[in-house]
Amino acid sequence: MEDFVRQCFNPMIVELAEKAMKEYGEDLKIETNKFAAICTHLEVCFMYSDFHFINEQGESIIVELGDPNALLKHRFEIIEGRDRTMAWTVVNSICNTTGAEKPKFLPDLYDYKENRFIEIGVTRREVHIYYLEKANKIKSEKTHIHIFSFTGEEMATKADYTLDEESRARIKTRLFTIRQEMASRGLWDSFRQSERGEETIEERFEITGTMRKLADQSLPPNFSCLENFRAYVDGFEPNGYIEGKLSQMSKEVNARIEPFLKTTPRPLRLPDGPPCSQRSKFLLMDALKLSIEDPSHEGEGIPLYDAIKCMRTFFGWKEPNIVKPHEKGINPNYLLSWKQLLAELQDIENEGKIPKTKNMKKTSQLKWALGENMAPEKVDFDDCKDVSDLKQYDSDEPELRSLSSWIQNEFNKACELTDSIWIELDEIGEDVAPIEHIASMRRNYFTAEVSHCRATEYIMKGVYINTALLNASCAAMDDFQLIPMISKCRTKEGRRKTNLYGFIIKGRSHLRNDTDVVNFVSMEFSLTDPRLEPHKWEKYCVLEIGDMLLRSALGQVSRPMFLYVRTNGTSKIKMKWGMEMRRCLLQSLQQIESMIEAESSVKEKDMTKEFFENKSETWPIGESPKGVEEGSIGKVCRTLLAKSVFNSLYASPQLEGFSAESRKLLLIVQALRDNLEPGTFDLGGLYEAVEECLINDPWVLLNASWFNSFLTHALR
């Protein structure tokens, strides 16, 4: 039979059939009848489409080969014969441009004249039996069915045969010829008898031998063999069954499974209120660095030495003054804290010998800023259980905050490239196995795309600050230790660079439990005027501390330099995770790898090189009010990294809850897009669970806004 197929059919058809069988894990040397059936079906699909065009007036015309008008639009789009991913892409494209309903199963053709998908069937049995099987499988009135047999019979939906008599006769003649050729070689009987009913992929796999015995032994109770269980599963109606089971559980439970349709979901309700404020542990897009290139000073690498060297690069210091007070704080204390820091650094310089660490004097302003002696005294419960009015503190409900544009700007900035390199390629030994070679190639490509990214700077900054703060918290528990906020990078030319963002002063830190809090005051340099977005800086007291000369197109311009000061706190567990922010690189690399794997499995070869080097291709990045945003593979890498970094920087119970609950809603919407007819009960309860996490967190509110954009475009 295999030889006959290769002689009888066009080599292109044979090649497509081989690919299709390979895709479903079938061996054409064994399944020779299936090989012949696939080739026959492909040929009928191609013949159905041949010579049929649509002219400029939108009329269907037949044009024989060699005709000069052959540049007309093809009447039929051929879907059969393409690999699954490409075929679904074509189907989705047709649905988007024509408004046709998306079919559940891949059809064979699309008819641009009648605006409908067509399912072609070729049967060795009775046409009406095969027609009913097809209709039963597809369950869609929108897809047109047309069945041909090897005996010259045909059957089509509503007896609408689509094509003219002559075109259909050509197909019937070809099928009759194939039958005659098979019969003359003694192949027809086997081929005719081998046809099974319309089958799904799962049914094609025959289980025999040991696996069959294991299958029969592994059934749920009350099933004697695999066939009985399969029959039960095929006839299973999940929605009704779940309703029935729930009603048996309790009289109070009454869940009706409601169909989830395009019109069912509503947008998430974002809270009203004043705009949300910045709550990260350090400044992001607004940070300013004082930097030294090619550091080679004495004590290079010791934070305090590096910090003093960076401070010396700036000459524009001036008498500080408050430009944006903190509404609830004692603002002069913040001002005095900065003045104290400058004075104590000056003392170090005057002494000439710089110590490795610096503990600040415990002044009244620092004691206030670090909450010294502010914690209520702890009393043993046994000593006060007789107190009649003993009760827990009344805690206020958190104030609702609305989404503000600054958080989207922060995210956009995190995705951008800087002019510095923040991570090096790992120095890893020679690859031993091919898989290691592919892995290190992917890692190197990915690193090249993200090494200049601002999100990578945030990772290195976060790792440094959390490591330094945790070390100081353990090594100098009672001291108000000064911790410079430092990062290191390379310039594009490869020169080393040390950057100072500002300082942290740590409070008392007797951290016994993971969640015990250490207070700290952060003082960070910036060129951002806080009066432009005062709501963003609600938690900060901002000082003007100097003037910085900047090079611009107009020559040198002077800009005021600000110091953003605030009291903050963290815990051992938060610092531990902050120290491990490099994991964000790994997480986003794994997401990119899964995209490469999907592409590679379709193409049947490793696509890493093509994936990163094909600069013309664009990929979906995310949803915005405009629709699906697309960008280069580098932009995708940086966006995924920025999302992972922001999940770390803005980690909170609100984010945990929103991620877990919105994921359920997302899966239901995905099921709807995949035509899986999802059903839900208590959808209102799910919305409630999602929306109770939308309180005041800027990152959660932004994600909720993205989710609404996704809903809008996914359900068009």
Curated annotation (Swiss-Prot):
Keyword Phosphoprotein included in the entry's annotation: yes
GO biological process, one term: cap snatching
Gene Ontology CC annotation, any one: host cell cytoplasm
Amino acids binding Mn(2+) 2: 80, 108
PTM annotation: Phosphorylated on serines and threonines by host kinases, including human casein kinase II.
Keyword RNA-binding: no
EC numbers, comma separated: 3.1.-.-
Official protein name in the record: Polymerase acidic protein
Organism: Influenza A virus (strain A/USA:Iowa/1943 H1N1)
Gene of this entry: PA
